[in-house]
């Protein structure tokens, strides 16, 4: 989880120009990437939810209750889609403003990250080379044992496992040694990057350009504006949900009443 969060943080701070792996489009903005991820997630939830509703309505209990959940679900999905279309331009404007306000900080951090990357790359290459050598050495040691197993009888399996165990432990110990060495080599650069980030933030705090207080004030203003502009769309969503909820309530009460009558008649 920490690695995923760090990757996302670096991605947004550096304004990475990654492309879709299935397309050769122009580089996406951070907002476009966030919007695409959110759209895929919402659509997946909506589709899976509709499948569950359809399965319930097709069941014996669903047919007996006849709640018409699928119709209500489609109405709700349509309302949510409309809300997303209305809020889209508003959130786009908010993200554009935020991206503009942090442009200088992102550029400076991008330079710092690239410089640190160039410094640590030799250590990473050396680690990869040593790891490949260790794996190849392990493969060479294990190969004869595999031949013994193919040529020998089933009872030699236990003997083979006993021979493989120390080799696997040796590979693990040697790998741990290389990892510890790499961690020690990279530690100064990690500290350097952390100090640089702290220095950038301190410079902002002391007034080198826009101060952190100004950033906070601007972000608060933009969030307030976002709330004001999104309020009509949210009200439309509420109004759109009312008939859906009312229809569901009527269907549910009718189903309960029908079930009560059947129980009383027995």
Curated annotation (Swiss-Prot):
For the biological process aspect of GO, one term held by this record is: cholesterol metabolic process
- Keyword Phosphoprotein recorded: yes
Please give the tissue specificity annotation from the record for this chain. Major protein of plasma HDL, also found in chylomicrons. Synthesized in the liver and small intestine.
User: Where is it localised?
Assistant: Secreted
Q: Would you say which domain of life the source belongs to?
A: Eukaryota
Coiled-coil intervals, chain numbering: none
- Determine if rRNA-binding is one of this entry's keywords: no
Q: Give GO terms: molecular function aspect only.
A: cholesterol transfer activity; phosphatidylcholine-sterol O-acyltransferase activator activity; phospholipid binding; protein homodimerization activity
Keywords of the record, alphabetical order, are: Cholesterol metabolism, Glycoprotein, HDL, Lipid metabolism, Lipid transport, Lipoprotein, Oxidation, Palmitate, Phosphoprotein, Repeat, Secreted, Signal, Steroid metabolism, Sterol metabolism, Transport
Where is the secretion signal located? 1-18
Please provide, in alphabetical order, the Gene Ontology terms of the cellular component aspect for this entry. Answer: chylomicron; extracellular vesicle; high-density lipoprotein particle; low-density lipoprotein particle; very-low-density lipoprotein particle
As stated in the Swiss-Prot or TrEMBL entry, residues carrying the post-translational modification Methionine sulfoxide are: 109
Q: Primary place of residence?
A: secreted
Q: Where are the sequence repeats?
A: 67-88, 89-110, 111-121, 122-143, 144-165, 166-187, 188-209, 210-231, 232-242, 243-266
Q: Where is this region: 10 X approximate tandem repeats?
A: 67-266
- What protein family is recorded? Belongs to the apolipoprotein A1/A4/E family.
Q: How does it assemble?
A: Homodimer. Interacts with APOA1BP and CLU. Component of a sperm activating protein complex (SPAP), consisting of APOA1, an immunoglobulin heavy chain, an immunoglobulin light chain and albumin. Interacts with NDRG1. Interacts with SCGB3A2. Interacts with NAXE and YJEFN3.
Q: What protein name does the entry list?
A: Apolipoprotein A-I
């Amino acid at each position: 989880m920490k690695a995923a969060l760090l990757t996302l943080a670096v991605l947004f701070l550096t304004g990475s120009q990654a492309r879709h792996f299935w397309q050769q489009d122009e580089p996406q903005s951070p907002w476009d990437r966030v919007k695409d991820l959110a759209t895929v997630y919402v659509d997946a939830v909506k589709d899976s939810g509709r499948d569950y509703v359809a399965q319930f309505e097709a069941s014996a209990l669903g047919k007996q209750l006849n709640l018409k959940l699928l119709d209500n679900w489609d109405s709700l999905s349509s309302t949510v889609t409309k809300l997303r279309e209305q809020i889209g331009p508003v959130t786009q404007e908010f993200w554009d403003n935020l991206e503009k306000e942090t442009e200088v900080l992102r550029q400076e951090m991008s330079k710092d990250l690239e410089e640190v990357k160039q410094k640590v790359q030799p250590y990473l290459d050396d680690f990869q080379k040593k790891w490949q050598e260790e794996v190849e050495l392990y493969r060479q040691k294990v190969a004869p044992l595999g031949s013994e197993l193919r040529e020998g009888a089933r009872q030699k399996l236990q003997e083979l496992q006993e021979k493989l165990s120390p080799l696997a432990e040796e590979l693990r110990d040697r790998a741990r040694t290389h990892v510890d060495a790499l961690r020690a080599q990279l530690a100064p650069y990690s500290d350097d990057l952390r100090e640089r980030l702290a220095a950038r933030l301190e410079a902002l705090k002391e007034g080198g350009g826009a101060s952190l207080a100004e950033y906070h004030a601007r972000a608060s203003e933009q969030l307030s504006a976002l709330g004001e502009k999104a309020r009509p769309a949210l009200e439309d969503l509420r109004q759109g949900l009312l008939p859906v909820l009312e229809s569901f309530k009527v269907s549910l009460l009718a189903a309960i009443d029908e079930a009560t009558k059947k129980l009383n008649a027995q």
